[in-house]
Amino acid sequence: MSDLLFTLHCAVRDTEALLGAIRTVFPAPIHIRAQSVRSQDYGDAGTAEKVSGELKRTTLELIVGADRMPNLLQAVKEARRDLPVRWRTTPLLDHGRIA
């Protein structure tokens, strides 16, 4: 089965809940990045974010086999989070580690 780069964008306050949910079904390393997003889409923004036009978000990335995606998405769906998440997968042609 091919490997995918799974990328998930979430509200900062939902980060820990999503990490816990993902860990229950997939033990791979998860890369966590804080992001600031300039946007006009304020559907899930806090008051300070609406005033500044800058959304604070967290990006989670991990490499997952395509066959594991249904379980991973189900865990994200069932996570105890407050706000919606955005996700995408990108096919990986090759990857590895160089020591």
Each model region followed by its residue ranges:
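Positively charged, small/polar-rich N-terminal and surface patches that mediate targeting and assembly
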Residues: 1-99
